[in-house]
């Protein structure tokens, strides 16, 4: 096990899958960052309005709006949150460049603005793009992150 990063970004799918499936690697990551217990957070977790809206939207679609509210409440109450604002100009430039898939620009900019050391996502396409083209942070699937840092 390596020294764990001080600041990480967790993609929408990590929150949704982790909250829905207690046996998943995503759930293990959420437990590690303190999602289930107030005051237990050691690591800083980067979030933005865009990420929180995605979590709420997906949770509402999969279950209901109450579950979405519960997830957001746990993020704000239990995690050591680093809230960042996204730069509209940078968003537009990335959209025009085509380097990062359009639907993933917001999550990328969130991790970048928060100076995350790690980016964790089940989105394999996004991880490959970020790792190959930007190299700004270590990119992991939830399984890779658990194996690298939590075992």
Question: At which residue positions do the language-model features occur?
Answer:
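Active-site neighborhoods of divalent-metal-dependent phosphate/nucleic-acid chemistry enzymes
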Residues: 81-119, 128
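Acidic, PIN/NYN-like endoribonuclease modules and their adjacent C-terminal/linker elements
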Residues: 2, 117-118, 124-151
